[in-house]
Swiss-Prot record:
ZnF locations on chain (MYND-type): 49-87
Naturally occurring in which organism (per UniProt): Schizosaccharomyces pombe (strain 972 / ATCC 24843) (Fission yeast)
SMART domains: SET
Biological process terms in GO annotation: chromatin remodeling; methylation
Protein's recorded name: SET domain and MYND-type zinc finger protein 6
Enzymatic class: transferase
Gene3D superfamilies named in the record: 1.10.220.160, 6.10.140.2220, SET domain
Entry GO CC: chromatin; cytosol; nucleus
Residues annotated for Zn(2+) 1 binding in this entry: C49, C52, C71, C75
Enzyme Commission code: 2.1.1.-
Phylogenetic lineage: Eukaryota, Fungi, Dikarya, Ascomycota, Taphrinomycotina
Family membership noted in the UniProt record: Belongs to the class V-like SAM-binding methyltransferase superfamily.
PROSITE patterns: SET (PS50280), ZF_MYND_1 (PS01360), ZF_MYND_2 (PS50865)
Major location category of this protein: cytoplasm
Gene name per UniProt: set6
Length: 483
């Protein structure tokens, strides 16, 4: 590999793998590069640049296919070597709708292979395993046939071979906050093996991908990432790995996990998958609480995430805050996704605080912020829309409808808690998302909130928040139970 800290090797039990050539500290950027090829989901094509993935208010579309969009002429020119064949296929398939992202990525992989046929050889393909599973092989034949037909490159077997490698080695293309953008493939990162307790994580910064260490890694230690959601129970993880990647995981976490389907939470999977409405998800949460289901076990994290989204759809920031606080408090995996949750929790916490402030002081100017301090005279500090989202704050009918007012939670104590969370988030984001736009945005928001709340900064250092967090946790739970 073209990186000084790692090397590709052949390992017993693993075959191909990647090891550290030196000691690597936590939060170290091991690899930073542009992904080799990417393809946006159809829903993102018109609002996202297909080269750099930047979202612009106005994008420029390709004049020929009128489907792929770019943020600038420079990005369009840079993408042309990969778009030229895709463009032809998109025009040919227009009557049948937009080609799916996996088919468009396959066409781009063909061009990558055409430039350097040896580049795909290190990739696992598992073509024999694909052919043994009728449904998987049907997908391979269908996508390969479409790519071959619309590009008029009649090499079906080659496209099938490339599809198998794509299916096993492609990654989800996401934003730094894990919002889905599409699919991508990188010929260096695909050499990393899987673990359900990985020591590295992949972070995207637009079309740039980073491999970042999650903990200290010793020289000659193998580097691992996770191919799947590590918050899922063991039985579901093993099924997903076997179905998509054709292997079973024997990492230490899996080997030491002796839970059964009755105790690992997988029995809730069907109900979670079918619970689309907020009220059904809240009913499921009440059932989990009533049977004493462990807060750190599946499906709590996934369920509370769905509840948060449902509350946001109703513009209920108190409910969204309650769900996310319970989710974040019980999260055993302090990874990049947890950091994103903490950032969203901070933003929702500011929204909740501003709602209380709006009800207590309804005549304040819309772009001013007051936090009454017990030790300092009240001050009015101007802020901006992006920090506290002061416009159109719903009151929900009165202070007793806010989570702080309903449970008599002091606004002063809540602000101190927010400052403590912000300080910890500032340290965590530098480790999880180093040198990314996301990290800069988080740090800027934290800097602004500390400036706005500067009268509290000396107080929060010595404040014991354990009792407060217990009260807040109970309030959040009751808020959802009685919703």
């Amino acid at each position: 590999m073209d990186a000084p800290l790692i090397a590709s090797v052949i390992l017993p039990e693993f075959g191909k793998g990647t090891v550290a050539t030196d000691n690597i500290p936590i939060g170290k950027i091991i690899i930073r590069k542009r992904v080799d090829i990417l393809s946006l989901d159809s829903a993102n094509l018109t609002r996202t640049c297909s080269t750099c993935t930047e979202e612009k208010v106005k994008t420029q579309r390709c004049a020929a296919c009128k489907i792929i969009h770019y943020c600038s002429k420079g990005c369009q020119k840079a993408d042309w070597p990969f778009h030229k064949l895709e463009c032809k296929a998109l025009q040919a398939s227009k009557q049948n709708g937009i080609l799916p992202s996996v088919c468009r990525l396959l066409i781009r992989l063909y061009l990558l292979w055409q430039k350097n046929p040896a580049i795909i050889e290190p990739m696992e393909g598992h073509q024999n395993e694909f052919q043994a599973v009728s449904s998987s092989w049907s997908d391979a034949e269908l996508i390969a046939s479409a790519a071959s037909h619309y590009t008029q490159i009649y090499q079906a077997e080659l496209f099938q071979k490339l599809f198998c490698r794509l299916a096993v080695n492609a990654m989800n293309l996401v934003t730094s906050s894990f919002d889905s953008l599409g699919m991508c493939l990188d010929t260096i990162l695909c050499r990393l093996n899987h673990s359900c307790d990985p020591n590295c994580q992949i972070i995207f910064d637009g079309a740039i991908v980073q491999l970042v260490s999650k903990r200290d890694i010793k020289k000659d230690e193998q580097l691992f990432i996770s191919y799947i959601d590590i918050r899922l129970p063991k039985s579901i993880r093993q099924k997903q790995l076997l179905k998509k990647y054709f292997f079973s995981c024997y990492c230490p976490r899996c080997e030491n996990d002796h839970t059964t389907k009755e105790t690992d939470g997988s029995k809730w999977m069907g109900r979670l998958r079918n619970s689309k409405s907020l009220m059904k998800n809240l009913a499921m949460a009440r059932d989990l609480w009533s049977c004493g289901w462990k807060q750190t076990a599946f499906p709590w994290s996934n369920l509370l995430h769905h509840i948060k989204l449902g509350m946001l759809d109703e513009s209920n920031f108190n409910g969204a805050f309650a769900a996310l606080y319970l989710k974040s408090s019980a999260d055993e995996f302090l990874d990049a996704l947890h950091v994103v949750d903490e950032y969203q929790l901070l933003l929702l916490g500011k929204q909740v605080a501003m709602e209380v402030k709006h009800l207590m002081f309804p005549n304040d100017k819309p772009l001013e912020m007051e936090f009454p301090s017990s030790s300092q005279p009240q001050q009015t500090v101007p802020t901006n829309n992006s920090l506290f989202l002061l416009k159109n704050i719903p009151s929900f009918g009165g202070l007793h409808h806010c989570i702080l007012g309903r449970y008599s939670i002091s606004l002063d104590d809540f602000v101190l808690w927010l400052l403590d969370r912000a300080q910890r988030l500032q340290q965590a984001v530098r480790i999880s998302h180093p040198s990314t736009t996301f990290c800069s945005n988080v740090e800027n928001d934290i800097k602004e909130i500390f400036e706005v709340c500067k009268d509290y900064c000396m107080l929060h250092v010595q404040n014991n928040l354990k009792a407060f967090e217990e009260k807040l946790w109970a309030a959040c739970k009751d808020f959802l139970v009685t919703y």
